[in-house]
C-alpha cells in the first residue's frame, strides 16, 4: 500500500477534488463540482478513467430547457397561422452526455474553469453533429428555410425572413410507403444534376434524371424538378404523387 505507484495514483486522484467548472450553454451558465461530474475515477498507467453517470441527470435537464432535437417547434406559416410542428424530423441538436462528460472531466484535469457546450452537441440523420445551436430566431428554426404545405400542395422558400419563391408541388403519394413525412428536417446535401433511383409500385426499377436534388430524409424524400410530370393538380398526391 506504500508503493510509489499507489501513492502517485492517490495523489493524481486527489488533484481532482473540490474543483468547479462552469458549463456554458447558449449564453447560460451552469456550475458543476467534481462530485457532480464524476461518479467514480481511477488512475492507472498514467491515465485517468472516469464514470460520469452522475452528470447525466443534469445534462438531461439542460437539454429539456435548451435542446431542439426531437421536439416540436412553434411556427408561423406563410398564411399567418400559428402551428406547433410534430416532434418528428431530423433538424435540431442536443448536448451529448458522453461528450459533456469527456469535456468536463478534461477541464478538471487541465484546471480550466469554463467549458463551452457548443462543442458537445449531437444530432441525427445524415449530419450527426447537430444543427441550429447558434440559431435562436424563429423559435430555433431561423429565417432561411423552406415551408411545405401538404394540404395546399405548395412550397414557400424563405431567405433572411423574406419569401423569395413560392411554387406548386406534388408531394409523395399518400400511402405508407411514399407519403411525405411531417416535421422539421434539414437539407442533407444538394446535387445538380442528379439521377433519382428507386422502385415503382409494380416492383420495376426507375432512374429519373433531374436538374436539382435536395434530399432531407435518409429514405429518399427531397426537393427536385420533375419534367416528366403532367398532373400538377392539388389532389395529384392522393394517388399519383411522387415516389
List where the protein language model places each region:
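Surface-exposed, secretory/extracytoplasmic low-complexity segments enriched in Ser/Thr/Asn/Gly/Pro
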Residues: 1-208, 212, 229
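Active-site scaffold segments
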Residues: 212-216, 220-243
